[in-house]
Each structure stands twice: as C-alpha cells, then as structure tokens.
C-alpha cells in the first residue's frame, strides 16, 4: 500500500482553515489509482478529519524526518495545495518532473536553492531543480538520512 504524507501548517494553511487540504484529499480519493493511506504530519489534526494516520510533526524539516522514520520503506510527500487532476498510479507519480532551468534567485528560498545549485556544480553533480513542480515527491528513510547527513 502507498502512503501519502501531507504536512500541515499549524495555522491552517493559506486560508487558516485547512480548506486546501480538503481539495487535496478529494483529488487523491478520485484520481489515485491503487491502494493508499493518508498520513497527516502535524502537531494536531483538524477536528473534521477522520480515517487518517497521524504522525507528529513540528516544522517542515522535522516533519519530513518524522515521516521517514515512521515509514522507512517510502512515502509520497504531498502538500495540502497539491491536487491530482487525472487518474495516476504510484509508479507515474514517482517520476518527479524537473524544471527546465533555474530561475533568478530573488526570494530567500531561491537564494538558498542557488547555494544548493552551486554546490552541486562544484561537486560535479547534475544541478537539477526539482523545487518548481512543488511535489508530490517520493522519499524513503535512506534518502532523508543522506540528504541531512552534511
């Protein structure tokens, strides 16, 4: 079974009521091909949600680590503003699209990504930008441990 992990912002997301999460869950229910479970990574679950796994999380990085420890064999990291618009299976979703190029680093987030890009180039690794598609992403524990190793 595939697990889809959705980290929640403690303040209820963009609209402060987790409404985006409702749309994301509905799209998964309608369009994910195959068996799945939903895991919400948050301090507290919304009062209205039922039938999901709760993984305690506090902050994005620690939530990702918590999910990886609880689901070491792998999971989809999904955001509450992601929607699955067409029937899609797990193998298709594991192929994360890459942006065609790197955008100009104007925001703090993009400036951090520029540091990542520069390090990849310095180490002779492919400098691919996976940040623009904004998920979903497939992770397992070994990937997370490697990413946070240095």
Spell out what each predicted region is:
Residues 1-56:
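N-terminal anchoring/stem segment of glycosyltransferases
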Residues 2-4, 74, 150:
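A generic secondary-structure signal marking the coil-to-beta-strand transition
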Residues 12-14, 46-50, 83-88, 92-94, ...:
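Short catalytic/ligand-binding loop motif for oxyanion handling, primarily in non-cytosolic enzymes
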Residues 56-64:
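Buried hydrophobic core signal strongest for RNase H-like alpha/beta domains in large
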Residues 63-74:
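Active-site nucleotide-sugar/metal-binding loop of Leloir-type enzymes
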Residues 73-85:
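Short beta-strand-to-loop acidic/aromatic patch adjacent to the donor-nucleotide binding site
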Residues 85-117:
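Conserved donor-nucleotide/metal-binding helix-loop-beta segment in metal-dependent transferases, i.e.
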Residues 104-150:
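Catalytic core and acceptor-binding pocket of nucleotide-sugar-dependent glycosyltransferases
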């Amino acid at each position: 079974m595939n697990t889809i992990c959705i980290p929640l912002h403690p303040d209820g997301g963009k609209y402060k009521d987790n409404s985006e999460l409702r749309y994301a869950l509905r799209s998964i229910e309608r369009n994910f091909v195959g068996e799945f479970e939903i895991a919400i990574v948050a301090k507290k679950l919304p009062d209205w949600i039922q039938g999901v796994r709760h993984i305690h999380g506090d902050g994005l990085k620690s939530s990702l680590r918590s999910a990886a420890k609880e689901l070491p064999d792998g999971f989809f990291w999904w955001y509450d503003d992601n929607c699955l618009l067409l029937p899609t299976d797990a193998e298709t979703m594991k192929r994360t699209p890459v942006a065609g190029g790197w955008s100009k680093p104007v925001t703090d987030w993009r400036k951090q990504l520029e540091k990542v890009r520069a390090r990849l180039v310095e180490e002779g690794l492919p400098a691919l930008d996976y940040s623009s598609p904004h998920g979903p992403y497939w992770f397992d524990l070994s990937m997370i441990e490697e990413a946070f190793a240095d």
